[in-house]
Amino acid sequence: MRKLTNFCFAGLILLGLSLAMCSEQPASKSATAVCDTLEASTPQQALAKLMAGNERYVAGQGIHPRSGMDRVAETAPHQAPFAGVVGCSDSRVPVELLFDQGIGDIFVIRTAGNNVNSESVMGSVDYAIEHLGVKVLLVLGHGSCGGVTGAISEGHEEHGNIGQLLGTIRNDVPQYVGKADSLDSAIRHHARVQVERILAYPHVAQKVQKGELLVKRAYYDVNTGKVTVD
């Protein structure tokens, strides 16, 4: 019995040492699958950090980093997210979860259809880029997007605010109206239009040209949980 107790105690010590190494030591290729210690000081590193998190999420190995009360206290005085994501309001697209990131890591802007065609949304994008200094900004479209579905549908009219929203999206994907079988292509194209809209602002384009920022289109597969970026 004493030997078993000593063995269990030694196991607990080793587990504690492993967790300490995970939180304190620089990441190696083998460690990144368990720990989220990747740097995000450059746009390329920031994107790699997001994609590594999504790989963990898809594999069912999410570690939910920086999500405890200590992180709440750390970020209370200020925020310094390394990434920004313009995502959809859809409840199936939980940005921090699908990238396996924590509190204060991602500045998230969610609108129906991940639409950037308004001053208020672009103001939020500017805030992320100019004031918070995010290194990467993704426009994240997703499969089965209701906003794009409604926008390209024929024979079904919405009125009021919803109708206005769908009309805005429809203007960005006119070639797909009436082509329900091309929904996925329409979703991806719509996200591309939003990226182009953001890059049309000179101050954003300048940061990209200087290598200080990446602005990319991304797509979230609601069936697999996987994010692809192009």
Where are these regions (language model features)?
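Conserved functional hotspot residues or short segments at active or partner-binding sites
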Residues: 139
